[in-house]
């Protein structure tokens, strides 16, 4: 998941995300099976995407902000997503996800700092994945769990909210907004000129 992100995204977007997808832990992704537009990570994040995000601790205090640039590509049957983060304190970080989608909407995946296998599922305009991550904290690391939700909106923006826990106790919330780097068609999150790989992935 920089101060000037507020000038790029409407101030109310993250508030809307918090209101719309609060209480994620009680939701099931199947509840959104009939919602449009359809969100498939390997379709939406194919090519270039930019995101703006922030992390609040359990007391509601803003701890960190970031901008992330992402590039997604199909490598055989796997979807590889490279994320380059720039945090408001100047720190930079790269994470590379490898996701294996299946026809029933289930996903399995890995990343360098993720513990074990990522488990995810998509339905309708929603995608939920759960994973454990070794998170840098000061000079050490914390092993934390993410319950991560994404929702594709009709204007092509994806709203993201993840609850972060340690030893089963919530320690904070990550909220982010993602937007494609090319214009959308009909506000459905699809680029004006669809690359061949994107068209094939959507079929």
Segments (PLM) and residue ranges:
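N-terminal helix-cap/turn-to-beta initiation motif at the start of protein domains
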Residues: 32-48
């Amino acid at each position: 998941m920089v101060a000037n992100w507020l000038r790029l995204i409407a101030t109310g977007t993250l508030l809307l995300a918090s209101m719309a997808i609060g209480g994620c832990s009680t939701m099931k992704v199947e509840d959104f099976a009939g919602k449009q537009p359809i969100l498939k990570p390997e379709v939406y994040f194919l090519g270039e995407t930019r995101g703006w995000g922030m992390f609040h601790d359990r007391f509601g205090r803003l701890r960190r902000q970031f901008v992330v640039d992402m590039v997604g590509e199909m490598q055989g049957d796997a979807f590889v997503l490279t994320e380059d983060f720039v945090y408001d304190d100047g720190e930079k970080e790269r994470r590379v996800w490898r996701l294996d989608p299946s026809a029933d909407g289930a996903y399995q995946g890995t990343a360098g700092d993720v513990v074990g296998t990522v488990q995810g599922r998509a339905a309708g305009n929603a995608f939920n994945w759960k994973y454990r991550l070794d998170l840098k904290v000061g000079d050490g690391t914390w092993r934390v769990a993410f319950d991560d939700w994404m929702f594709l909106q009709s204007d092509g923006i994806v709203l993201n909210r993840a609850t972060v826990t340690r030893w089963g106790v919530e320690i904070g919330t990550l909220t982010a907004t993602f937007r494609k780097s090319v214009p959308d068609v009909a506000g459905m999150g699809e680029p004006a000129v669809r690359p061949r790989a994107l068209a094939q992935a959507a079929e």
